[in-house]
Regions:
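Conserved catalytic core of the tyrosine transesterase superfamily
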Residues: 1-401
């Protein structure tokens, strides 16, 4: 049995045990996990008492010292500072300890922080896209500017080309093109803010790689149905996972769009779903009956989730909105259940497009379903319509058919 009452707590944090227990219960933590976090509180509280410190002194540095002292005493060998994150979060949320101290940014960090704000506010990019762009930006200013903001104004086309060529030596073609896109974005920002006096984004070389050079990676016919059938709809997790997979398979939604989906995005009277897409776009889609049924079953089983408006929630602790990694894990588990290789959520999107193509849907309709802004993006699926391609293929010289 795991009972909180068995944990001896003394010191200035002892009065907060009940608050921590209530917070953990509200987030779905079980008795075993709750007891472990109360033990962390007891360790910190005893340390404060021994050192004569107030609760406000608790921070990451104190935790590191505490863990080091325990290790030196031969205790808690498996204990790490990250084990105290939940406790620190609780203490800060209650105002018991101050928020994380704001670190003074270096000049180059100030520059990159301005770029991040530009991506968020003016470009309205998704969080995952911003993360990729910021990684490229940090790499570029480190290599091309030696982490010195004063050298940004002196950037030349040769510096830009030299950086991209260097990336090409250590990265594959797909990764290089992602870096190229990020560097172009950063240089456009520099020019927009007057940090450089020439539009150097035009000097970024592209890697020669045709958009139509590869086939879209899709699913074999029938696999999508097997993934859906693998969900145990007798459980809340199974009902939720079935709804998630249904949206991937039937509407071809992107994983970020499922993450952003809120309960209020569905207009049940008109049978319409508003998708929060890339670039801040909001696209209305008709809600098929089977998709609506899957969502109704999940929401009915899930019940109210307090003030949180997100559609998909974690069932296990810590409860809260599902992140992209959680949604990808739903697909990964389904693949394991049906005995197929792990597949990406985007391959389910490709699978929908190819299935529509097999049933005679024209490319422009497929583009509407997938919400492509450019028909050229949809044109890649023409390469997998083998029946149509066979009618226009030239016979090989000398062949009989």
């Amino acid at each position: 049995m795991y009972e909180v009452s068995r944990v001896r707590v003394s010191g200035p944090l002892a009065v907060h045990v009940s608050g921590l227990v209530g917070c953990l219960a509200g987030r779905g933590y079980g008795s075993k996990s709750t007891v472990e976090h109360v033990r962390r509180l007891a360790q910190v509280s005893r340390w404060l008492e021994r050192e004569g410190l107030e609760p406000g002194a608790v921070d990451e540095a104190l935790v590191v010292r505490l863990v080091g002292a325990l290790h030196s005493a031969g205790k808690g060998r498996s204990l790490a500072p990250r084990s105290f994150r939940v406790l620190l979060g609780f203490l800060r949320s209650q105002g018991i300890v101050p928020s994380e101290r704001v670190r003074v940014l270096t000049p180059i960090e100030v520059l990159l922080d301005g770029y991040r704000n530009y991506l968020v506010v003016e470009r309205a990019l998704a969080a995952v896209t911003i993360t990729g762009y910021m990684g490229t930006a940090g790499w570029f200013v480190s290599e091309a500017c030696a982490n010195d903001p004063c050298r940004v104004a002196a950037l030349s086309a040769a510096d830009v080309a030299r950086f991209v060529v260097g990336v090409g030596r250590v990265r594959g073609p797909r990764s290089v093109n992602e870096v190229v896109v990020g560097v172009r974005s950063l240089l456009r920002y520099f020019y927009l803010k007057g940090l450089i006096d020439r539009p150097l984004a035009q000097a970024v070389p592209w890697l020669a790689r045709g958009r139509m050079a590869t086939l879209p990676r899709t699913l074999e016919p029938g696999v999508a149905g097997r993934l859906l059938a693998s969900c145990d709809r007798g459980t809340l997790v199974g009902v939720r996972d079935f709804a998630v997979l249904t949206l991937f398979v039937r509407l071809g939604l992107r994983v970020g769009e499922l993450t952003a989906m809120e309960v209020g995005d569905i207009d049940w009277r008109s049978g319409e779903l508003t998708v929060r897409g890339k670039g801040g776009w909001r696209d209305p889609l008709p809600l098929p009956v089977d998709v609506g049924d899957a969502l109704v079953a999940y929401l009915t089983r899930r019940g109210p989730s307090g003030e949180c408006r997100q559609m998909f929630m974690r069932i296990r602790a810590p409860r809260g909105p599902m992140a992209m990694t959680d949604l990808r894990a739903v697909v990964r588990r389904a693949c394991a259940r049906v005995g197929i290789a792990d597949t990406s959520t985007h391959r389910l999107r490709h699978g929908l497009a190819c299935d529509l193509l097999r049933h005679g849907a024209p490319l422009f309709e497929i583009g509407q379903v997938l919400r492509h802004r450019d028909l050229e993006t949809t044109a890649v699926y023409a390469k997998v319509d083998f029946a149509v391609l066979a009618t226009v293929a030239q016979r090989w010289p000398g062949s009989e058919s």
